[in-house]
């Protein structure tokens, strides 16, 4: 990969991914965000970090006032923990990144300039590509698709992935059938079909269903989709044999689940191709019981993010209303 790190299973047959999402940092990064990021890396010791969008608090006016250099500075701060530890990482984008005034394509070029960023030059939208994980013989044994799930809203609603992204995905999915996992920012509409999972906030998926889930299901080798976007959600459900999961937000410059912010560790085994294990590593468990800002933590924990502002359980009785 043009001198970039080579991704392969460890000698013990495992491969570990740390999924981080919604850091949403501005021009002055929050200390708690960096504490969590460093603790996640030291605790998980992953083979790969996947960032699934909203790395930037793009709606902050400071980015547009200060220009591209401010974006570069923030991205440098957020990627330095991986760079210092020589941990490969890959990046896709959310709905807020482009709001900083710098296009996702320009941001992707900034990321690619760092030695341990393994994002290839995209064939379609920035943030849309796949990564091969090889076994000891050099053969591809596992694949991760990173998808640009869209960053624009239409009449106040989230737009689905662009047609060109779906065409690319369809082409790649059916070239080979490799055990795979998908990472993107915005959840699929099918997340609303998950049963017996705890909702900590409303599922904010596109109103228009463009058939992405059907493509993944028809491939037959997709284990799961993991996303962010809805900062407090952290469930893993299942629809038609595909796990649909959330990772809670990892940033402290936006709303979130208080000291339960964190990242998701995923462990794969070379001899169990369609099997994985996962757990959420939380700030309160790996950094400290409370954050450095107890007032914000209180409001994060007690302010409702969906009406009627309570934890909901999706099951067969209320599925149609979810």
Regions found by a protein language model. Give the residues of each.
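His/acidic metal-ligating clusters that form di-metal
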Residues: 44-48, 143-146, 157-234, 302, ...
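Divalent metal-coordination and catalytic microenvironments
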Residues: 22, 37, 49, 54, ...
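Active-site-proximal beta-strand elements of phosphoester/diester hydrolases
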Residues: 14-24, 141-151, 183, 242-249
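Surface-exposed cleft-lining segments at the edges of enzyme active sites
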Residues: 24-25, 59, 64-65, 151-160, ...
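Extended active-site neighborhood of metal-dependent phosphoesterases/phosphodiesterases
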Residues: 2-9, 66-175, 221, 264-270
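Active-site environment of divalent metal-dependent phosphoester hydrolases
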Residues: 26-28, 57-60, 91-103, 152-155, ...
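N-terminal active-site segment of His-dependent metallophosphoesterases
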Residues: 1-77
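Binuclear metal-dependent phosphoesterase catalytic core
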Residues: 3-6, 11, 130-138, 212-219, ...
């Amino acid at each position: 990969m043009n001198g970039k790190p080579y991704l392969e299973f460890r000698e013990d047959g495992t491969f570990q991914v740390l999924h981080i999402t919604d850091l949403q940092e501005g021009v002055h990064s929050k200390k708690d965000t960096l504490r969590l990021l460093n603790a996640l890396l030291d605790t998980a010791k992953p083979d790969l970090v996947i960032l699934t969008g909203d790395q930037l608090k793009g709606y902050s006016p400071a980015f547009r006032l200060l220009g591209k250099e401010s974006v570069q500075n923030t991205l440098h701060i957020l990627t330095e923990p991986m760079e210092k530890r020589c941990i490969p990482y890959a990046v896709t984008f959310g709905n807020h990144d482009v709001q900083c005034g710098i296009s996702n394509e320009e941001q992707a070029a900034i990321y690619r300039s760092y030695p341990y960023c393994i994002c290839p030059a995209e064939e379609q939208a920035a943030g849309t590509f796949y990564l091969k994980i090889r076994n000891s013989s050099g053969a591809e044994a596992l694949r991760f698709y990173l998808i640009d799930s869209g960053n624009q809203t239409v009449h106040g609603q989230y737009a689905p992935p662009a047609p060109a992204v779906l065409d690319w995905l369809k082409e790649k999915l059916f070239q080979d059938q490799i055990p795979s996992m998908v990472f993107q920012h915005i959840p699929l509409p099918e997340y609303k079909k998950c049963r017996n999972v705890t909702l900590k906030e409303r599922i904010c998926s596109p109103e228009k269903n463009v058939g992405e889930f059907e493509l993944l299901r028809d491939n037959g080798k997709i284990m799961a989709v993991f996303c962010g976007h809805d900062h407090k959600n952290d469930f893993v459900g299942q629809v038609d044999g595909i796990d649909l999961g959330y990772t809670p937000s990892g940033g402290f410059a936006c709303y979130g689940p208080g000291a339960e912010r964190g990242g998701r560790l995923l462990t794969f085994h070379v001899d169990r191709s369609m099997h994985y294990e996962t757990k959420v590593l939380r700030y309160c468990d790996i950094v400290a019981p409370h954050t450095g800002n107890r007032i914000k933590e209180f409001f994060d924990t007690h302010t409702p993010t969906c009406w009627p502002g309570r934890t909901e359980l999706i099951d067969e009785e209320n599925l149609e209303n979810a």
